[in-house]
Design a protein with these regions (language model features):
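Short glycine-enriched, charge-decorated loop/helix-capping segments at active-site entrances
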Residues: 118-123
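A Rossmann-like FAD-binding core segment of flavoenzymes
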Residues: 127-177, 193, 199-209, 214, ...
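FAD-binding core/adjacent interface of flavoenzyme oxidoreductases
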Residues: 22-82, 98, 129, 141-217
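N-terminal Rossmann-like FAD-binding beta1-loop-alpha1 element of flavoenzymes
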Residues: 77-103, 227-235
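Long amphipathic alpha-helical segments
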Residues: 1-25
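Glycine-rich FAD pyrophosphate-binding loop
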Residues: 100-116, 243-251
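Residue-level signal for short, function-critical loop segments
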Residues: 85, 224, 248
Length: 307
C-alpha cells in the first residue's frame, strides 16, 4: 500500500496488529526481527519495514483530519492493566480491539513507562509517545495516573471492583549491579536512575531539588541500547569524555548497529575487551576512576556469543 501511495490503507493494516507504530518504527530492533527474515535480504537489502512503519505512522499523526478510530462495541468485560509501559499499552490496544473495557493504572504522573522515563528525547520524542497514548484513549482505553497497585489499591480490590482479569506490566525496574568494590560511592548511578531523573524529572536543571552533577569524565559499563542512551545523555549533559567499557569485542556488542554508529559519531569512546573490577574514590568518597581488567575472547556460549 505504501508503494501504491495509499498511506491511509497502510496505516489501517499496520494498526490492526500494532497499537504503537510510531514508537516501534523508531526503537524496535527490526534488523534482528522482521527484517532479518525478509527474503529480499538474501540477494540484497531487506525491505525497510521499520522505516516504512515510521513513515506511515508519522503521516497519519500529521494529518489535519484523521479518520475515526474503529473499535467494536463493549463486550461488558472489564480488564485492569498495571503499568503503562510498551507491554501494557500493547495489551490495552489489543484487548480494546476485541471489545474489552480496559483501565490502565500507572504509578507515575506520566504515562508511557520506559518509553517516557527510559528512552531519551533525542531517540524517541515524548510527543510521539503522547500521541500514541492519545490514540488508545480515543479507542476508549482509560488511564489512571498516580495509582500504585499494591498500595493505592490491591489486586484483590481490583477484582472486588468488578475487574475480571489483571495484566501485570510493572516492568523490570530494579537495575543489575556488578558486585564489585566501590559500587556505592558518590557519583555511581545505575542507568535506570540516571535516565529516569533526566528524562522524566528534568534533573539536569540547576534549580532541581537534587540535580544530576555535571561530570567531565564518565564511564558507562555495558554496551546494550540502554548503555548507549546513558552515554549519549552524559555527553549532552556536558561530559568531555564518555567511555563505554565492555567485556567483549565490537562484533559482540548487544546494542543495535544504528545506536552504536550514533554513539561513535557523537564522540563516545569505546573500551572493548575490558571488564570492570573496582571503582576508586578520593578522600571525599567521590569517584575518581574505574579499574578495568583486559579480556580475551573465548569459545562461543550456548547462544553463539563468544565468552
Amino acid at each position: 500500500k505504501v508503494a501504491e501511495g495509499d498511506f491511509d490503507a497502510a496505516y489501517e493494516i499496520i494498526t490492526s496488529t500494532n497499537s504503537l507504530p510510531a514508537v516501534c518504527g523508531r526503537v524496535c530492533p527490526q534488523e534482528k526481527q522482521c527484517e532479518s527474515k525478509c527474503v529480499r535480504g538474501i540477494k540484497g537489502e531487506s525491505v525497510g519495514i521499520g522505516r516504512l512503519e515510521r513513515f506511515v505512522a508519522d503521516y497519519h499523526m500529521n494529518k489535519e483530519v484523521k479518520d475515526e478510530i474503529k473499535v467494536p462495541e463493549s463486550n461488558g468485560h472489564r480488564i485492569a492493566i498495571v503499568g503503562s509501559g510498551p507491554a501494557s499499552l500493547t495489551c490495552a490496544g489489543d484487548l480494546r480491539k476485541m471489545g474489552y473495557d480496559v483501565t490502565i493504572f500507572e504509578a507515575f504522573h506520566k504515562s508511557g513507562g520506559v518509553l517516557v522515563y527510559g528512552i531519551p528525547q533525542f531517540r524517541l520524542p515524548k510527543e510521539i509517545v503522547a500521541a500514541e497514548i492519545d490514540n488508545l484513549k480515543a479507542m476508549g482505553v482509560k488511564i489512571i495516573n498516580n495509582a500504585i497497585i499494591g498500595k493505592s489499591e490491591t489486586v484483590d480490590e481490583l477484582f472486588e471492583d468488578g475487574f475480571e482479569a489483571v495484566f501485570i506490566g510493572s516492568g523490570a525496574g530494579l537495575p543489575q549491579f556488578l558486585h564489585i568494590p566501590g559500587e556505592n560511592l558518590l557519583g555511581v548511578y545505575s542507568a535506570n536512575e540516571l535516565l529516569t531523573r533526566v528524562n522524566l524529572m528534568k534533573a539536569y536543571r540547576d534549580d532541581y531539588d537534587t540535580p544530576i552533577k555535571h561530570f567531565h569524565n564518565v564511564c558507562v559499563v555495558g554496551a546494550g541500547n540502554v548503555a548507549m542512551d546513558a552515554a549519549r545523555v552524559s555527553k549532552r549533559l556536558g561530559a568531555e569524555h564518555v567511555y563505554i567499557a565492555y567485556r567483549r569485542g565490537k562484533d559482540e556488542l548487544p546494542a543495535r548497529k544504528e545506536e552504536v554508529e550514533h554513539a561513535e559519531a557523537e564522540g563516545i569512546e569505546f573500551r572493548l575487551l575490558n571488564n570492570p573490577v573496582a571503582i576508586h574514590a578520593g578522600e571525599d568518597g567521590h569517584v575518581t576512576g574505574i579499574e578495568l581488567q583486559k579480556q580475551e575472547l573465548g569459545e562461543p556460549d550456548e547462544k553463539g556469543r563468544r565468552k
